[in-house]
Amino acid sequence: MAFLSDTLARVKPSQTIAVTNKARELAAAGRDVIGLGAGEPDFDTPDNIKAAAKRAIDAGRTKYTAVDGIPELKRAICEKFERENGLKYTPAQVTVGTGGKQILYNALVATLNPGDEVIIPAPYWVSYPDMVLLAGGTPVSVAAGMETGFKLTPEQLEAAITPRTKWFIFNSPSNPTGAAYTRAELAALCEVLMRHPQVWIMSDDMYEHLVFDDFDFTTPAQIEPGLYDRTLTCNGVSKAYCMTGWRIGYAAGPVELIRAMGTIQSQSTSNPCSIAQYAALEALSGPQEFLATNREAFQRRRDLVVSMLNEAKGVTCPNPEGAFYVYPDISGCIGKTSAGGAKITDDEAFASALLEETGVAVVFGAAFGLSPNFRISYATADEVLREACARIQAFCAGLS
């Protein structure tokens, strides 16, 4: 009898984590490495949020909490949804988990049966398909390439829906492309979904506050009230509030679903960290001005990276609307040989040779379901990005 489960054989480790770990190992060994794999802001958690956590510790708020979040945080989340998205929820419709990833996973485990399908536009966050597999469902990837701005069309969505479809995962702005759907584009998708009442919508809004050029962020339940009762609107404090290590995600949706997710959490991790919950409460309720300051920095970095990558031979880099990623196409590099003798057969070979020969760590596109591309996280200092892009330019210039 095999010791490891059949389920494990169907999933793979996160490639973004693998690339980040590889870069750290090389740096620890003395290599000059620039890691652009991690989707993590380089800015520190704001002082008022850290102070709230310290107050919670001093006040002895170090015990178990309610499984799916303290009441104060749930109320703050309700206020956030109404203030920023025009969505009204009660605390009973809100759940808090140990990061956005747990929120999504809880929902999938609570709802999927064998044979249930989940539509996932590609390129996608690396964890979506594997979480569906772990939950017993079937991921259905639909390619949304550069020709559509990395956005799913209504026609593609309609064609992908079957009687077995249970969820549609929607992520805007997107990881890995930074693409964000306009109000009109989202409305067109919602029109399709209104024709299929068996399909639920999982909206991953983690990058909501990271949109550029005065882009108007919208979310499905906000655009189409008719979808409110079958939409799980997911968010968290990791990206916008520079709190990736605090591990707090949250979602709002129908009470029956929220209760089911709470049951899953009660038998897995139980409550999120009590101190982190009080920090998240301050994040959502405290001063918000720094969001605009950070957004300006990310927009400046985006402009720098897009400009420099488009000067690299064989590379085409679209200009994303949000998040802190770019997803350049490297069709012009495939089939060539690097200065170090590496055959660039695909985007994984490109990323491997780039790391080995220049010390720049990126994530290859196949990990996100669409090739030939690679992802760069530009959530790091301008001078680091400038050096990394210069190395990429030199690497591409050396291909023959």
Swiss-Prot record:
Subcellular location as annotated: Cytoplasm
Q: What class of enzyme is it?
A: transferase
- Keyword Cytoplasm assigned: yes
Q: For this UniProt entry, which segments traverse the membrane?
A: none
**InterPro entries of this UniProt entry?**
Aminotransferase_I/II_large, AspAT/PAT-like, PyrdxlP-dep_Trfase, PyrdxlP-dep_Trfase_major, PyrdxlP-dep_Trfase_small
Which BP terms in the Gene Ontology apply to this protein?
Answer: amino acid metabolic process; biosynthetic process
What EC designation does it have? 2.6.1.1, 2.6.1.79
Residues involved in L-aspartate binding: 39, 125, 175, 375
Supply one GO CC term from the record.
Answer: cytoplasm
What does it do?
Catalyzes the reversible conversion of aspartate and 2-oxoglutarate to glutamate and oxaloacetate. Can also transaminate prephenate in the presence of glutamate.
Record protein name field: Aspartate/prephenate aminotransferase
Organism of derivation: Cereibacter sphaeroides (strain ATCC 17029 / ATH 2.4.9)
